[in-house]
């Protein structure tokens, strides 16, 4: 095996490209978008994510362009502190958490991928593939064909590679909540060393520092599977939700329509079948997209990427390598996914025990991957 083809240029796909290239493989990455992402909210990088970022070689860049916090503080709607927990659960030598804009993280990964020699193809959406005993050929939307030894689908929750491999359309499970997210600029020195969460009933609002004067806000509220919030109503809807939280006055008065509000429904995909067939493998959200409750989506995708490269390097036979990858990754990723969705379910129904599940997840994450 010499040449690897990756579908998807998000966090998982770029991480896989870097890992495989460092392992000595020739790598081509196909991304459907015509250029690297220019928008997006923030992303939280807990300690296990920082550990894999270090292994990937991008830890220093992420910390340089991110904002580190040590505490997670939870408040009621009046702004009264309910409790705080340390974000350090794995390694005292690492920051508790690094928060970074998704666009910035993509830029960092793109820079490192290009530096190690990944061939990046923009505007190339993989829509099908054909296999022989010797190779796999991906068909792009524009008609171009690309041949490789392995095709890795890191093409997200709506993965074409996954659905072609499984020969069915994978159903997305609605988790009962919608999420609104937006970037915000605030006065200097607003933030120090903590991420904030505000709760009232079934509404949760997170305020995540990206700098001492800037951050991103996410709002979680119940919604039906057929609900959608149009772009032109999102700003006013979010402002109305925040107005019920006196403790969030410092956010509400600085909201600006210059920064668009992103909306999506919380959905998950849990692939119960093997993640590989023949010369095709999936990873990241294509295999285990889940709730953002524990901020583990990106971390799990990067772990997938590193393990895939290790197993392909360790085994000359592709079937043995892909099976070893699946056996290492599926139990851990699906366990974290299940815990994340169960936390959403309990909070949605007002049931106790969500905090205990967070501790259970941390215990899983302390184990090697």
From Swiss-Prot:
The keyword Oxidoreductase applies. FAD binds at residues 12, 31-32, 126, 285. Its EC number is 1.14.-.-. It comes from the Bacteria. Pfam families: FAD_binding_3. Its cofactor is FAD. Coiled coil: none annotated. This is Putative FAD-dependent monooxygenase YetM. The lineage of its organism: Bacteria, Bacillati, Bacillota, Bacilli, Bacillales. The gene is yetM.
